[in-house]
């Protein structure tokens, strides 16, 4: 009886502890991020949207680090309407990728950079409401281009 009580009390203390997140190796982070980006690109390619030959609008300079990458992905996600085709899965995968990158940043970056506004995409709510499908398609196409650029420059994810 005494052993049972002692065991129960010791297990109670363990349940009250919170695990300390371990610093992840940046190589593992880049490998997982690469896989997640590739999955998103496959999903974007598989969906049927008008494919425009858009001139490149992003350069490697736009990948200032993980904070700016996460901010851009979150902005793309906010511009994509739930009402167009099969975008719910794409939005879920974007959220998963941004959550993973945010978690990695939180655990591995000592100094957190503040989020900045993302230039080049419509921000006004009224414009988004009036042209919701056009804004969604534009955001999907821009995100596809951005993800391809990110795939070629995964080292920028290590920059805090």
Curated annotation (Swiss-Prot):
<keyword id="KW-0732">Signal</keyword>
<keyword id="KW-0964">Secreted</keyword>
<dbReference type="GO" id="GO:0005576">
    <property type="term" value="C:extracellular region"/>
</dbReference>
<comment type="function">
    <text>May function as part of a signaling pathway that acts to regulate the size of the body fat depot.</text>
</comment>
<comment type="similarity">
    <text>Belongs to the leptin family.</text>
</comment>
<dbReference type="InterPro" id="IPR009079">
    <property type="entry name" value="4_helix_cytokine-like_core"/>
</dbReference>
<protein>
    <recommendedName>
        <fullName>Leptin</fullName>
    </recommendedName>
</protein>
<keyword id="KW-1015">Disulfide bond</keyword>
<feature type="signal peptide">
    <location>
        <begin position="1"/>
        <end position="17"/>
    </location>
</feature>
<feature type="disulfide bond">
    <location>
        <begin position="109"/>
        <end position="160"/>
    </location>
</feature>
<keyword id="KW-0550">Obesity</keyword>
């Amino acid at each position: 009886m005494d052993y049972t009580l002692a065991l129960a009390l010791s297990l109670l203390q363990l349940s009250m502890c919170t695990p300390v997140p371990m610093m992840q190796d940046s190589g593992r982070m880049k490998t997982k991020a690469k896989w997640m980006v590739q999955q998103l690109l496959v999903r974007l390619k598989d969906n049927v949207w008008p494919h425009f030959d858009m001139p490149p609008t992003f350069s490697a300079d736009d990948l200032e680090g993980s904070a700016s990458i996460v901010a851009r992905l979150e902005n793309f996600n906010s511009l994509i309407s739930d009402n167009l085709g099969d975008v719910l899965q794409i939005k879920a995968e974007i959220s998963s990728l941004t959550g993973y990158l945010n978690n990695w940043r939180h655990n591995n970056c000592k100094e957190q950079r503040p989020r900045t506004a993302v230039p080049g995409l419509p921000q006004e709510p009224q414009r988004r409401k009036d042209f919701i499908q056009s804004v969604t398609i534009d955001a999907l196409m821009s995100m596809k281009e951005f993800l391809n650029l990110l795939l070629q420059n995964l080292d920028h994810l290590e920059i805090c």
